[in-house]
Amino acid sequence: MSNLKTKLKMSCLYLFVVIVAFFIIRLSLFLLCFDYFSTLSNNEIFLSFLNGFRFDFSSIAIFILPLVVFLFIPVNSKAYTKIIFTLMWLMFFVSLLILAGDVVFFSIFNKHLETELLSVQTHFSFILQTALQSYWYVTFSIFLLFFITLYFTYRYINKNFVFQSQPKFILKSILIILCIGLIMLACIRGKWDFRGKPLGIMDAQLLGSQKTSELILNGIFSSAEGLRRMEDRTCFLDKQEAINLARNITPSEQEIDSDYPFYRYKKDFSFGTGDYNIVIIFLESWEREYYEQYPEAMPNFVEITKNSLYFKNFYNSGSRSLTSTTSTMFSIPYVWGLPFITNGLGAKNMSRMASYFKEKDYSTIFVATDNASADKIGEVANYSQFEQFYAKANIPVTHKYPTYTKGFDWEGFELFFNKINSSKNNFLGFFYTSSTHGPWDMILLKEYQLYPQTTRDNQFLNRLYYSDAAMGNFFNLAKQQPWFDKTIFLIFPDHHVPFPNRTYDSNLRDADKYFTSFLAIYAPKIFKPQQIDTYATQEDILPTIIDLVHSSQPYSSDTNSIFDKERSKEIYIYAENKKVYIVGPDIYEEIDLSNINKVKELIAEDKLSYYQKKAIARNEAIYHSLKNHKWHKKSNN
């Protein structure tokens, strides 16, 4: 068999394996998320799978076929052929991991991967540890399969590779490369007509409903499109119209510069002298459903809420830690078309939480029980101008724990207490738990096992019980200190627990399914216990603590202090899947901005409600302000 025939035969077999793998991944997505796709008809499902091949071929053409082109470069070398096939199989296994990761991601968030691949580096140590510990057998199997594949590939090349005469070999190689090039162009465009634009996500949306398009797409295609269009988004409103609709300066605030529509300072404070310590306790994956249904799993927190200002209409700003952290620390929601704080958004000017305490000579202390590299939390804390930062590597472990990829809240809370207790000044403290982060299949401390480890919920509840005990120990220590009486604690979760294929009460509204939360403002010597109906999100935390300590520094936000009586009654939640939820005392509305043509049609026909239009305006105004450096003035902060 000639060299070219060997390459052609092996290439066809390779591409067949790749196409089958893409199909199996789509089938896995459909079966794993069957409840989500169950509303599709049989015809819609069939057409989705059929159209899915177009988007699979496009992904293969962009990321895999270029290596096949290199294979047919007229190099008459057995070693060269082995190197290219090694790269081809490596690309296949990497693609397989991305596709499989996308299925898991979709089962949690009901959206495909987009720019999330950029955050892989921030979770690399966690992913690696999880792969080598909790899923070592899967990791081992993948590596074993990879090397077995290489073994048989090399063996076949050694057996069938023969050298060819140069003139014919070169000519045939060039013809094959030209044919592959034409196929690549056709696949990238999704048709044989080479005019017009390449295949895009909108093409999938035009083929049917939102769920149809989601079944058509794959994680590689959606990620490539998301990264390509990271700073390019469709804006539905005129820029100035969006800014005018989005302005929300209340009478207690003062606008500073009309060119900076969200830049203001607080001129009238809600109450008190401002001479308070502030402590934020950011709870990994805690949520209201577990608090209400399993109070025995968090007895210390239940006791705290009885003596707190308890905001029962508090909502998370996102489904992921990075979104919630950005909202909490910088008062910026999820903004489509802009990168995450750790991938470029940090280059924009914005309000930095700890800076508002420097003018008052506060100590600023941030403790995270997770690794500093997780979501680059160390960099985020430093960017927020916290003077002291401590993470898992800085926390002495005093209990005997099993091997766990995250950190231990008991020792973390103790370190946090020691650091704020040693402060000679007032302080801002930020504590970020992580012991309730998955995987949950191991008991951290036997004495804090409340339930048998037989179900996923029980495993998580045992973690809650441990983390709650750690927080209870912290407050027992804090109550004995003189600074406790003038300290305001703000306690709230980052997001819901991300169980794959989690089922919710069908009677719940989507915003309540995915974002409902709680906020306890605990200061028994300052506030009388009360349940408060105010609607608020994590975006409100920064304006609120600025209000509490009477900071006169300018800040930028599209929201207001939670205590501001003139603030809007409704809140806006911008989900990572481009859905917007508007929630208030007498309002609940949604709008899906991923369906661009539908939104344009609603605008053209003037069918958007006032709140839907305002929701679009707010996000677009924030986008324009951040992108054009009109969000915050650097010189002041």
Task: Give residue spans per PLM region.
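Glycine-centered secondary-structure boundary/capping sites
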Residues: S59, T81, N110, Q129, ...
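Solvent-exposed soluble domains appended to multi-pass membrane proteins
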Residues: P251-N637
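The feature marks either
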Residues: Q205-T212, I216-K267, G274, K306, ...
